[in-house]
Amino acid sequence: MMICHQCLDQDDSSEEEEAVSVYSPSTLVKLARQRLLREEALVISALKGLPNMLFPVIFEEAFINGHTKILKAMIPMWPFPYLSVGALTNNCNLKTLKAVLDGLDILLAQKVRSSRCKLRVLKWRDEQHDFCGIWPGSHEAEDLPELMTQKHPVQNNPDCGVKKELRVTTELSVMKGRLDDSATYLLEWAQQRKDSIHLLCRKLVIETLTKDTVIEIFKIVNADCIQELELYSLCLEDLAFLNPYLRQMDNLLELTLDHVTDSLSMGDSEMCEEEMITLVSQLPTFPCLQKLCVNDVYFIYGNLNEILRCLKKPLVSFCISNCELSQSDLDCLPYCLNIFELKCLYLIDIPLNHLCLDPLGFLLESVRHTLECLELKSCDMGEPQFNALLPALSQCSHLTDVSFWENELSLLFLKQLLQHTSKLTQLSYELYPAPLECYDDRGLILSHRLEQFCPELLDILRAKRQPKDIAFVTNPCSKCGRYYVYDPKTQRFSLEDTTL
């Protein structure tokens, strides 16, 4: 039997049924999509006999194009244990969400379920996974059983271990104090079906806290199932309010604190130092925390030891940016054993020119066998500060990424720095500041000098190893914000305005 491509596109269901036996899967996928767009009722009626391999592509097409009846009908027949909608939810509307949840309601209401349906976990909003998660076997290890695949599982975790008919995992974002309509509807839906549905929030983002919204979230969501928490634009009083919930987050892996001020939520008054110290000391211990990112948080100054006290397991990634540190903050580093296995250390926009960095050098020596990424950017570091780090830096043999941009180093000292980094054979990304000789007395960038000095600097590295991705960059222009970048491949400089 032969069928031409023109006949294949004709609206003849009998011919299409015959084509199933002779055409490749890719052709069948195309045919299924065409039929989907033309006859919604036919697709729904054919679901019982539809091959498993066609379910994902038809579901995707229905989701993107808003075929809510098809979505509702497919859920009770889903032939895989997992359905990860992933990035598709970014552009979906409330009507689409309701259709998916209506499908789950049909499934829950069935006294005798179809032998074909194997759905156990619906991943609704998950930025880390795309739509490929609907294919069988793609993410099965993540939820079998709950929390057992974590590196540091918590032994006593009854809430997350509850066995219910279905699990729905999602990410929630409270923006400007409120949830969006879809998240609100999902929470209300889950609350009404709490006996049969287990709603898990893996990632919670809060930007500007509204207490009523947070209370409603934790009436439904188990805090000990949250693995990523991002807090933006809060005051210390807000952290005090969140503290009871933070104490329940025994499985938290990543924590971001961004722009936390000392102003009270009511009025412009500020907390006294004693109140601040009390609140900071009450921050809970996180048994599983692996990544900590702190940006523009005023209470870090003089209290870094209290922050690091919250760690129970060794930290993997530590980032501090747009903060001020005291000498006592640095002095505590050699005694914080929970940062001695760091893979990534980022200190960004922190003035260090007035501090003794010997303790930081000790930390680098302690993590020399684990550290892979080191960023000391825009820290106003000069030669005395770098001198304290160079002996330990040259021992960090596992480093793959380094950035020392926006620090003040002379040409002579930059050569000395490169003599040390030339020994680091695993480096694949390097960002160095242009030497001070590339500026005149007024701070004007002398781009021709950058082009003159950089080949000489590169030769220092090439004598020991072949650099991969490397650049020498001037400080940003105070007027336009752009900077000159020397590219070794073209042996020319260029004016850039993109983020490095």
Curated annotation (Swiss-Prot):
Protein name: Oogenesin-3
InterPro entries referenced in this protein's UniProt entry, alphabetically: LRR_dom_sf, PRAME, PRAME_domain
Chain positions of LRR repeats: 116-143, 198-222, 223-248, 249-285, 286-311, 312-343, 344-367, 368-395, 396-420
Swiss-Prot/TrEMBL GO biological process terms: negative regulation of apoptotic process; negative regulation of cell differentiation; negative regulation of DNA-templated transcription; positive regulation of cell population proliferation
Keywords: Leucine-rich repeat, Repeat
Stored PANTHER family: OOG4 PROTEIN-RELATED (PTHR14224:SF22), SIMILAR TO PREFERENTIALLY EXPRESSED ANTIGEN IN MELANOMA-LIKE 3 (PTHR14224)
Family: Belongs to the PRAME family.
Tissue specificity comment: Expressed in ovary, specifically in oocytes. Detected in follicles with two layers of granulosa cells, and are present in early as well as large antral follicles.
Superkingdom of the organism of origin: Eukaryota
